[in-house]
């Protein structure tokens, strides 16, 4: 600033440089006086470039460094198959492969000299014993539990439509059955410790609400979730600030309060009571298969 003042005496237009230099000077002064980031304190202004590069580093790796086969958990080749199938375009790549066919773990399918027709009904599993009046023929591969709220509206819709197209089941997650789950795909209704979608005002199991939802044609099986998979022995919580009116309605919880998933169930406390609870759910659902997830 002092230098600009001296130059101004000789050449007044130098004041225009303050339009550019002024903000940089202020940023530099703030960097030198702050106490949170040592990089900015030691390298005022230019130190911000480090954080900018850190911000865009995933994109740099994806577009300039990562090869078609080196990405994790899904490399570019695998992602491309998903993109192409979602657009209903050809997903095959002819003229050889870029993979190392001699690498450990490489998988392939050998040609058969006597190929046979594969009946899709033979690669399904019948779920439900003699006590089930409505057993379910389940696919070997299905969509695991992911609730609406953890996933977006469009994601849930896409998954359920995919379940319908592929003739496999879609697990709702413990967040209950949302309108976005009801796109025609078979459902496995997961019930957690919060009994979302079938609970009383004080968070206990509500048989009437359960019966109303479980008897829907789209619901094929019910899964009891015994505890939080990511933190067994502990509960979960959805802060009131993140609770929307739609999610509150779907989960049958009041607005303005934290939504708790307790560490354990209140409908049963012993293995024998669990078996009795399973019997109760089977009867309320009209004889559909009931299982539990450890």
Language-model features, listed with the residues they occupy:
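Conserved, well-structured core domains of diverse proteins
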Residues: 1-169, 175-185, 189-190, 194-230, ...
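Alpha/beta enzyme core
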Residues: 161, 177, 181-183, 202-294
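Short amphipathic alpha-helical segments with coiled-coil-like heptad repeat character
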Residues: 171-172, 282
């Amino acid at each position: 600033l002092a230098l600009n003042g001296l130059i101004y005496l000789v050449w007044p237009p130098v004041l225009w440089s303050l339009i550019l230099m002024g903000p940089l000077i202020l940023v530099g002064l703030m960097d030198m006086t702050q106490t949170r980031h040592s990089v900015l304190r030691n390298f005022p202004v230019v130190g911000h470039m480090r954080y900018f590069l850190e911000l865009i580093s995933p994109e740099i790796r994806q577009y300039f460094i990562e090869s078609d086969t080196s990405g994790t958990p899904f490399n570019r080749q695998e992602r491309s198959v998903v993109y192409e199938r979602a657009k209903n375009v050809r997903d095959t790549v002819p003229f050889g492969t870029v993979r190392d066919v001699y690498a450990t773990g490489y998988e392939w399918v050998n040609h058969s000299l006597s190929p046979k027709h594969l009946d899709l009904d033979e690669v399904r599993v019948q779920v439900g014993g003699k006590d089930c009046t409505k057993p379910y023929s389940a696919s070997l591969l299905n969509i695991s539990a992911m609730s609406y709220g953890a996933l977006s509206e469009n994601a849930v819709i896409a998954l359920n439509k995919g379940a319908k197209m592929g003739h496999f089941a879609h697990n709702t997650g413990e967040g209950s059955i949302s309108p976005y789950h009801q796109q025609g795909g078979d459902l496995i209704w997961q019930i957690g410790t919060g009994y979302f979608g079938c609970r009383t005002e004080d968070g206990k199991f509500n048989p009437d609400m359960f019966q109303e939802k479980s008897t829907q044609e789209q619901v094929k099986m019910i899964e009891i979730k015994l505890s939080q998979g990511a933190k067994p022995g502990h509960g979960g919580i959805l802060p009131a600030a993140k609770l929307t009116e739609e999610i509150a309605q779907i989960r049958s919880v009041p607005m303005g309060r934290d939504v708790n998933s307790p560490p354990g169930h209140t409908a049963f406390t012993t293995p024998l009571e669990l078996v009795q609870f399973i019997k109760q759910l089977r009867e309320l659902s009209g004889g559909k298969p009931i299982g539990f997830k450890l």
